[in-house]
Regions:
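N-terminal, polar/charged subdomain of small-to-medium soluble alpha/beta proteins
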Residues: 1-125
Length: 125
């Protein structure tokens, strides 16, 4: 399936397991891949109405900017929910990276893929 991608989004928010880690906003690096079944037709017809507008990047930033989270996993879930509100997006892959408070480790991150199907019963393992 064809996809659009948004890479290098910098999203400031407070995220981390400890209070000191969340004391100041961190710049998260976000990459988004939007899987859109109609993308081919947008390209053939040169029709903006059949594709996802890049303004979605601003919506993604606004969804988490300035908020506080314990986990980057939650940040990724929130971003996926926002992306899937667009009816042209079938599923989405979100990658979120942050600089961890661990010496010698440049980045820590998570990547998730979510679709329109219901999540079902989310029981703890």
């Amino acid at each position: 399936m064809d996809s659009l991608f948004l890479e290098g989004l910098e999203v400031p928010c407070r995220v981390g397991c400890s209070d000191p880690e969340r004391a100041t906003p961190q710049s998260l690096r976000v990459a988004v891949r939007l899987f859109c079944p109609g993308l081919r037709y947008a390209g053939i017809a040169d029709d903006l109405e059949r594709t996802v507008d890049y303004r979605l990047a601003g919506e993604l930033i606004d969804a988490v900017q300035g908020r506080e989270y314990l986990l980057i996993e939650r940040v990724a879930e929130v971003l996926a929910e926002v992306a899937l509100k667009n009816p042209l997006v079938d599923h989405v892959t979100i990658s979120v990276r942050k600089r961890p408070p661990v010496q010698g480790l440049e980045w820590a991150g998570v990547e998730i893929t979510r679709g329109r199907e219901p999540a079902g019963d989310l029981q703890r393992a």
